Amino acid sequence: MARSLTILAIVFAVATARVTKSESPKEILAQVNKDSFGNSILSVLQLQLATGGPVGEIQILLNNIASQLNGDQKKADKVHESDTVAFEKIIADLEQEIAYHQTQIVALSNLRDSTTEALGEAEVEVRVVTSDIANNEKSFADESATRQSQHDTWVRKDAEHVDQMEAIDEASKIVQHLQAGVAFAQLKSRFEKVQAKLMESKHALFKPLINALTQLASKVDNKSIIKILELLAQIRQQLVASRASLLATEERQAANWEVQSSHLQEEHKRLVERKAFLENSIVQFKVTIQEAVEDLEDQTLFLEDAEDSLAIQERWAAEQESQYEAQTFEREQQLEVVERLQEVLTQKLSAASEFLQVREEVF
């Protein structure tokens, strides 16, 4: 058994020699003999045959070597196939991860850029809206002051009309008293007050009346009284009409201001709400940009890690493939050597005498 193992080890070492199919048995043995292990195995084989050892035992050993090499190759093929499947799965996952990070980077870059553009537009618009609010408030203040001035003017003029109408009514009463026969001396005090009030107004409308009343103070006659009463009635009617016109103007201006102020207030509300919306949007835009920049940095790092992992896996796979191919090639060469030795033993060295003859021819 020990002898068989020794021969097996020597033959296995010899099997690593690389030969070509066109070589003759002499050439094969010559190449084997150049190696120390080859020389030893040839010596053992020669001794084996010289002492009558069976050639079949050597054939069995060579068959065992070939079987071992084929078995090792099958195991290597199986491991290689399993590693290839696992590698392809890892590569597919990494490529998918890389594609995901690349997509995220593009999306985040677009988000950052579009949000930055939107931020710039919002900042410009908020300045415009702020200016519009200031203009709106100024317009409201100016128009409100104008309206207040209009109202104050109406109040003043309406009060003047009331005073004037009261003076006309008082003058009518005095004239009617004179017409009824009351002495002027009894009405003088009232007459002078009315006359003074009418003169204070400095209204052209009252000038004929003032002149008529002045004449009446010096001479009272029925004809003059009738003319004065008619004049008083006309003046009062004009005052009533003028007062009504002023009131109509006041009401129209008040209604217009109510509409205008409502529009200004609505515009102010809209502008304030728009400004608040824009300011809130600006805050959100800045947050979004910051988050996008941070996420972009993270995704870039993740992409670099995934690409590094892919490169490492590809290098590992290339090394494994190279090692597998080298080992496969080595086994194929070893099997070829074993097959050549088997061919020599089977076809050329079937008898001990023939082997010894070839041995002597070679060496």
Curated annotation (Swiss-Prot):
A single Gene Ontology CC term: trichocyst
- State the signal peptide span: 1-17
Which portions of this protein are annotated as coiled-coil regions? Answer: 85-119, 244-352
Q: Which UniProt keywords apply?
A: Coiled coil, Signal
Q: Where in the cell is it found?
A: Trichocyst
What domain of life? Eukaryota
Residue ranges annotated as propeptide are 18-52, 190-221
What does the UniProt PTM comment say about this protein? Two components are produced by post-translational processing from the precursor peptide.
The free-text function statement in the UniProt record for this protein reads:
Structural protein that crystallize inside the trichocyst matrix.
What is stated as this protein's family in its record?
Answer: Belongs to the TMP family.
* Name of this chain's protein: Trichocyst matrix protein T4-A
User: From what organism does this protein derive?
Assistant: Paramecium tetraurelia
Per the record, the gene is T4A
